[in-house]
């Protein structure tokens, strides 16, 4: 452990005794400050303006802080190294290096104590809590506005009472001057703090907290004070040290004074702040020495001035207005030097400027190999200069470094030869900003080029997210052998084949390469040489050369294939010469079937091939294959001559028909609206959906049209008829259906700046041209897209930073933790469609237990086995629906995670290595797509993308229906209306194995019966997507209750139609009036209330905004709709809409209009209502449990009725559930699965794939704290939030001693809070709220064990991840071995001494 000031001192790496592994921060005592100091600064002067030498005893004094020049005293008497260590008797300066001016500190002896503003103003104010005072009262004492009673003596005053000048005069007159003692200023506060007996105060508070029962506020206040006292006792700090009597002065080199032209100086603001303080302090000292006596008011004013100048020095602007300089800019105080982006932490310690680096524009280098980059000669010479000098000297071309320098300046051929030798096998690092993930920095072998731009291999563009429209990249040279080795082994572009985010290949061909391969693998009817038979590739090349066949001719080829029995046989294959040329590139072997390349190649297909080559043949073969693929793609992209032409833009003929059909639909909705059948909101949603369907239909016809090619021109070959635009879109090389739809279909629906969709689409396309009106409504959406790019990129970037901050200290620490817990993984189903298969989710995970085939009972997976591609195929074949796998969330390691719980390292495809920084990888994987997708918005130009609202579930395969909880009634239209809130429709195969299940919502129509056999596409359940119905269970007559016009119900007249809708409103009631609960009651023919199946009256409560569908007195049948609750209008679905949801989840914020969930299984009852709240009581099934009462807002729709049976976790009010509630009720696993599904839904919408384990890592960091519910015999305070690891370790010690253990419950924190409350105060301080974090840490005397990445970077040590992890492990083993050897030697010596 080291003192924090030792950071100023240079550590000698060779001397291991100076190395440290933890750092403690404390409040400095006056004695400690004096021990740091090399002398007292008594003068405010800096340097002499004539001699430019530091003034003696001033802020730059050479006697105190050290010599200005190396080994030279100020007066010049002693010069050079031979006098090292001598103190000049004339000027008093020690002869040493000038670097000591960066380390040596001075001090000021204050004439009057001052309160440190961090302990006064940093909320909560530590001094005010400790003295149990109000902050305003404390400030009045410190700033000499009021006196405080320190000892009441014989007077009736109390200790701590505040007295103004008048009150003091009155008290002195009444009780006498000597009968009580008062004080003022920081000195009085210091005395009060020094008088505190912390241990007895702690005992008194512990008793007091046990006696407080009713007041929650009072209890929290006592606990806060108790926690602070515990911190002081534990750290050894004394409370009076928060009042400063000796002020340290930081070394002069850290607050420089720089000479500019024309004799002017630029000075750090700190010098001015110190100068003001010294002047005031000196004046106060002088006033105190005056024998005549200075009036008290003058003295107090001067003391206040000293306090104010100290406040400005510590934290300018913390209290009142910031003090400004002559340029009207606030002075930069010590606090400002630390915090923010320009502060010491983020500017100088975490982000340093790098030597041996350069930057230039990038251009494409298609002739490079994957591991190479083109480096301009001049740039390379500048970067590798020292190496070139050494090479010239070694070869005997230059005798000295000076001579080598001259030769390099001349630029002789020897220099270039030396440079070529030097850079051979010396990798360089290329970095493209923004560095969003680890693939933004990769290593390459440089190839010297004559240009002035860096050449980049096309296949790494995806990883760097680079294009060649003016992008720049930085080059860095790894200097040491270790750095070069790491660059080559870990960072080489050939090692970065798979994406760490999802495990898919990232060096996949793109753009023109894909287009070339697509063209090459096309199969066209009627081409020359169709039907010919070939036996070898030589024949194919010969035939192509002689133009006997074309690339696209349908031919037969004799080839070895693997048959169904797994035997190698010769067979004739129907293919094309182009596909055979692609197949020729595959590595030798039979692992990849020719069928994989015997089809038209799109981007997805090519990616699949690269993936297969990597899995079956390894890294080297993949790199070679990718390079060959790229060259082939470029070649045929060039030969194809595919280009973008006006004639390729064919507007679909059916467009006008689709427009007319949709207009008729819209007119029908207008009619329904004008007749009052639907509301304005429902009409809006239906119109939006109609136009969404229209654009989809036009897009389909458009793609069919351009796929058919040019059928009108005469004399064209089939190849010439191909449509270039279709080929670009179909191959996924360039453009997308969305963009082509705007060109030759319809631009479609447009979003307003607010995100709401305009219900009138742009029917024209860019090929036909827009009307003035269409252009006008299209402009805001386009501009919004561009504005979003700027605004949302910042939001996404901040999310990335917060994620990294919360997870940077999370590594793989062990091979296996031995847990038997895990997550049960099933396929993700949305609207009855499997969007993510089980196989995709479990790939690369480790099985918790043995998995058997449900039919044959054959063992498929063993416990502890990793699920690879082969096992995934077996799982699919066996039809398994769920598997329990190891998860980061359930890992039982106290620190970090074990390799088995993490599973596969997605960037290598193997089990994760110990020491991998999985936290950082997770943060980058989640943050990077967010940034990318916000930047992608502007390519679509404001067109709104919104999926049509689902209104039914359809069978995804043939099967048999099974209905669970089938509570339904048959309505007047002979339809089965579901009345249960827990009804589920299960689709099973012929064997009875469940394929998928659908949760049928209340009020939906059941279209099938239990046990019915259905075919694929059959509708199972249907519902109204725009409104939630309130349905009657019984037939009867309607009676309204508590519906008073203008009070609880309102007639809303639609201005455009004149239709009146009766809408429930928030009842306007005064105090003491009867509470109104608008509801519909059902009566029988005798006007008596009907009873439901649960024995209660048939009453249906109506929430605010529900629209009545029946009139009073109407006769209704069971299953009829009484009222409708409109759903919200839909906005656009894109990442800018989704990112706030992701942030809301990661920050664990409470959603607006959140859901309320049932905490236990039980029966619903409604209690007596409050004025604006409803009381719901959940009667538990278990009689041992207490009923739970929920107070619900009246306006919200309660999804349950009286007598309903609910399960734990069911929603009582609709909305997004609060994450903390899920954790409390359902546990960690349920919380994890909910967050994963919600976040994946946002990214899935954009086609981004992120592995679940990355989200799991972040959730684990959010769950690292627990709340103490019972402190037992520990030092923890009840309701204190502590690190889980700390509690477990404490409990272990208590258990050994036979004492009571502390009880706790898990709590969920947002990533920002988790980052600020991390174990490392250095990491937290460098993130946000620097002053608050350091204040807290200093009081508690926190120890930073330097376990994360940031804290090690800040203190300049090797990070404990990757290579650093193994170095640390080797050092640990070596230390242990040394201890054992020393212990053995000691024992041997002792034995020898005994014998002697």
Swiss-Prot record:
Give any single GO term for biological process.
DNA-templated transcription
Q: Which cofactor does it need?
A: Mg(2+); Zn(2+)
Show the coiled coil region(s).
none
Q: Please provide, alphabetically and separated by semicolons, the GO molecular function terms listed in this UniProt record.
A: DNA binding; DNA-directed RNA polymerase activity; magnesium ion binding; zinc ion binding
Q: Which InterPro entries match?
A: DNA-dir_RpoC_beta_prime (IPR045867), DNA-dir_RpoC_beta_prime_bact (IPR012754), RNA_pol_asu (IPR000722), RNA_pol_N (IPR006592), RNA_pol_Rpb1_1 (IPR007080), RNA_pol_Rpb1_3 (IPR007066), RNA_pol_Rpb1_3_sf (IPR042102), RNA_pol_Rpb1_4 (IPR007083)
Q: Which residues bind Zn(2+) 1?
A: 73, 75, 88, 91
Q: Write down how the cofactor binds this protein.
A: Binds 1 Mg(2+) ion per subunit. Binds 2 Zn(2+) ions per subunit.
* A cellular component annotation (GO) from this entry: DNA-directed RNA polymerase complex
Q: How does it assemble?
A: The RNAP catalytic core consists of 2 alpha, 1 beta, 1 beta' and 1 omega subunit. When a sigma factor is associated with the core the holoenzyme is formed, which can initiate transcription.
Q: What is this protein called?
A: DNA-directed RNA polymerase subunit beta'
Organism of origin? Orientia tsutsugamushi (strain Boryong) (Rickettsia tsutsugamushi)
């Amino acid at each position: 452990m080291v003192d924090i000031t030792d950071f100023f001192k240079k550590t000698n790496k060779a001397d291991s005794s100076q190395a440290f592994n933890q750092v403690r921060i404390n409040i400095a005592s006056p004695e400690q400050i004096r021990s740091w100091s090399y002398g007292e600064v008594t003068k405010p002067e800096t340097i002499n303006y004539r001699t430019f030498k530091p003034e003696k005893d001033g802020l730059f004094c050479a006697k105190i802080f050290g010599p200005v020049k190396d080994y030279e005293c100020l007066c010049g008497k002693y010069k050079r190294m031979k006098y090292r260590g001598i103190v000049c008797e004339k000027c008093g300066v020690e002869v040493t290096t000038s670097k000591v001016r960066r380390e040596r500190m001075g001090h000021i002896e204050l004439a009057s104590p001052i309160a440190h503003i961090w302990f006064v103003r940093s909320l909560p104010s530590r001094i005010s809590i400790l003295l149990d005072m109000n902050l305003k009262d404390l400030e009045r004492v410190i700033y000499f506005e009021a006196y405080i009673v320190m000892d009441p003596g014989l007077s009736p005053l109390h200790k701590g009472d505040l007295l103004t000048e008048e009150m003091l005069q009155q008290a002195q007159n009444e009780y006498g001057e000597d009968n009580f003692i008062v004080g003022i200023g920081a000195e009085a506060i210091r005395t009060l703090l020094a008088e505190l007996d912390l241990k007895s105060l702690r005992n008194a508070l512990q008793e007091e907290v046990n006696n407080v029962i009713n007041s929650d506020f009072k209890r929290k206040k006592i606990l806060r004070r108790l926690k602070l006292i515990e911190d002081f006792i534990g750290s050894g700090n004394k409370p009076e040290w928060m009042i400063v009597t000796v002020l340290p002065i930081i070394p002069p080199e850290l607050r420089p004074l720089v000479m500019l032209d024309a004799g002017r100086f630029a000075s750090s603001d700190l010098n001015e702040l110190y100068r003001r303080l010294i002047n005031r302090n000196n004046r106060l000292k002088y006033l105190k020495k005056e024998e005549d006596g200075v009036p008290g008011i003058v003295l107090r004013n001067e003391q206040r001035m000293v306090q104010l100048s100290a406040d400005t020095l510590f934290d300018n602007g913390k209290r009142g207005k910031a003090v400004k300089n002559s340029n009207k800019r606030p002075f930069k105080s010590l606090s400002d030097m630390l915090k923010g982006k320009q502060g010491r932490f983020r500017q100088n310690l975490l982000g340093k400027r790098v030597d041996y680096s350069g930057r230039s524009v990038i251009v494409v280098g298609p002739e490079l190999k994957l591991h190479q980059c083109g480096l301009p000669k001049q740039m390379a010479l500048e970067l590798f200069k020292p190496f070139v000098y050494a090479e010239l000297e070694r070869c005997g071309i230059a005798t000295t470094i000076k001579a080598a320098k001259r030769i390099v300046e001349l630029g002789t051929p020897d220099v270039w030869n030396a440079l070529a030798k030097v850079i051979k096998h010396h990798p360089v690092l290329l970095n493209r900003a923004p560095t969003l993930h680890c693939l933004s920095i990769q290593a390459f072998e440089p190839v010297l080029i004559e240009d002035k731009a860096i050449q980049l291999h096309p296949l790494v563009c995806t990883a760097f997210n680079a294009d060649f429209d003016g992008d720049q990249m930085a080059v860095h040279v790894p200097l040491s052998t270790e750095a070069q080795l790491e660059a080559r082994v870990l960072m080489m572009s050939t090692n970065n084949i798979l994406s760490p985010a999802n495990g898919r290949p990232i060096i996949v061909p793109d753009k023109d390469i894909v287009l070339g391969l697509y063209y090459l693998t096309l199969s066209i009817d009627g081409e020359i040489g169709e039907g010919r038979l070939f036996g070898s590739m030589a024949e194919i090349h010969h035939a192509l050369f002689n133009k006997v066949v074309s690339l696209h001719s349908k031919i037969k080829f004799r080839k070895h294939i693997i048959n169904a029995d797994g035997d190698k046989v010769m067979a004739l294959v129907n293919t094309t010469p182009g596909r055979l040329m692609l197949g020729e590139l595959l590595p030798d072997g039979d692992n990849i079937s020719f069928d994989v390349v015997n089809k038209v190649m799109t981007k997805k297909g090519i990616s699949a091939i690269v993936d297969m080559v990597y899995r079956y043949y390894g890294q080297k073969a993949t790199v070679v294959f990718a390079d060959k693929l790229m060259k082939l793609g470029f070649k045929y992209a060039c030969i194809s001559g595919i280009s973008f032409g006006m004639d390729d833009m064919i507007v679909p003929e059916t467009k006008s028909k689709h427009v007319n059909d949709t207009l008729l639909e819209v007119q029908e909705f207008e009619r329904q609206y004008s007749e009052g059948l639907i509301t304005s909101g429902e009409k809006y949603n239906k119109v939006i959906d109609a136009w969404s369907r229209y654009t989809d239909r036009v897009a389909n016809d458009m793609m069919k049209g351009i796929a058919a090619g040019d059928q009108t021109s005469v004399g064209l070959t089939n190849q010439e008829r191909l449509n270039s635009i279709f080929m670009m879109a179909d191959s996924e090389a360039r453009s997308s259906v969305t963009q082509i739809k705007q060109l030759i279909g319809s631009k479609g629906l447009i979003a307003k700046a607010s995100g709401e969709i305009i219900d009138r689409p742009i029917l024209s396309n860019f090929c036909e041209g827009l009307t003035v009106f269409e252009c006008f409504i299209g402009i805001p959406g386009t501009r919004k897209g561009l504005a979003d790019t700027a605004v949302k990129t910042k939001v996404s970037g901040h999310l990335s930073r917060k994620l990294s901050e919360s997870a940077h200290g999370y590594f793989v620490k062990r091979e296996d933790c031995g847990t038997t817990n895990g997550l049960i993984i099933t396929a993700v189903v949305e609207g009855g469609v499997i969007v993510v298969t089980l196989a995709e989710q479990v790939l690369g995970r480790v099985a918790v237990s043995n998995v058997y085939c449900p039919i044959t009972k054959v063992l498929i997976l063993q416990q502890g086995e990793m699920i690879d591609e082969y096992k995934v195929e077996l799982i699919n074949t066996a039809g398994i629906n769920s598997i329990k796998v190891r998860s980061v969330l359930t890992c039982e390691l106290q620190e970090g995670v074990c390799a088995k719980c993490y599973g596969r390292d997605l960037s290598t495809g193997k089990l994760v290595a110990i020491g991998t920084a999985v936290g950082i990888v997770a943060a980058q994987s989640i943050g990077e797509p967010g940034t990318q997708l916000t930047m992608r918005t502007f390519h679509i130009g404001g067109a709104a993308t919104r999926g049509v609202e689902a209104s039914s579930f359809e069978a995804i395969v043939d099967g048999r229906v099974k209905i669970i909880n089938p509570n339904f009634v048959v309505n007047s239209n002979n339809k089965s209306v579901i009345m249960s809130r827990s009804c589920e429709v299960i689709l099973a195969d012929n064997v009875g194995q469940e394929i998928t299940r659908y949760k049928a919502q209340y009020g939906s129509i059941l279209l099938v019966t239990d046990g019915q056999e259905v075919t694929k596409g059959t509708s199972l359940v249907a519902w109204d997507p725009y409104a939630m119905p309130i349905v009657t269970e019984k037939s009867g007559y309607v009676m309204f209750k508590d519906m008073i016009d203008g009070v609880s119900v309102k007639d809303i007249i639609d201005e455009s139609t004149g239709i009146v809708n009766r809408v429930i409103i928030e009842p306007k009631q005064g105090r003491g009036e009867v509470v109104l609960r608008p509801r519909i009651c059902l009566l029988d023919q005798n006007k008596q209330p009907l009873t439901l199946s649960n024995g209660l009256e048939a009453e249906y409560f109506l929430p605010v905004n529900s629209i009545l569908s029946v009139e009073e007195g109407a006769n209704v049948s069971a299953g009829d709709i009484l009222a409708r609750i409109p759903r919200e209008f839909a906005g656009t679905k894109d990442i800018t809409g989704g990112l706030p949801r992701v942030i809301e989840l990661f920050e664990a914020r409470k959603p607006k209009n959140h859901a309320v969930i049932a905490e236990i299984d039980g029966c619903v009852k409604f209690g007596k209502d409050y004025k604006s709240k409803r009381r719901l009581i959940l009667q538990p099934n278990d009689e041992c449990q207490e009923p739970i009462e929920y107070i619900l807002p009246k306006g919200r729709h309660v999804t349950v009725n009286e007598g309903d049976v609910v399960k734990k976790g069911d929603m009582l009010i609709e909305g997004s559930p609060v994450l903390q509630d899920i954790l409390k009720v359902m546990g960690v696993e349920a919380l994890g699965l909910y967050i994963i599904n919600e976040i994946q839904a946002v990214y899935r919408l954009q086609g981004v794939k992120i592995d679940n384990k990355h989200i799991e890592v972040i959730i684990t960091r959010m769950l690292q704290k627990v709340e103490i519910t019972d402190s037992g015999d520990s030092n923890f305070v009840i309701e204190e939030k502590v690190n889980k690891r700390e509690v477990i370790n404490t409990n272990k010690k208590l258990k050994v001693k036979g004492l009571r253990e502390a009880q706790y419950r898990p709590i969920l924190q947002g990533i920002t809070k988790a980052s600020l409350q991390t174990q490392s105060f250095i990491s937290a301080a460098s993130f946000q709220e620097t002053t608050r974090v350091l204040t807290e840490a200093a009081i508690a005397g926190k120890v930073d064990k330097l376990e994360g990445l940031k804290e090690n970077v800040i203190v300049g040590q090797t990070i404990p991840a990757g290579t650093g992890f193994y170095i640390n492990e080797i050092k640990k083993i070596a230390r242990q071995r040394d201890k054992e050897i020393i212990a053995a030697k000691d024992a041997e010596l002792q034995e020898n001494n005994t014998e002697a």
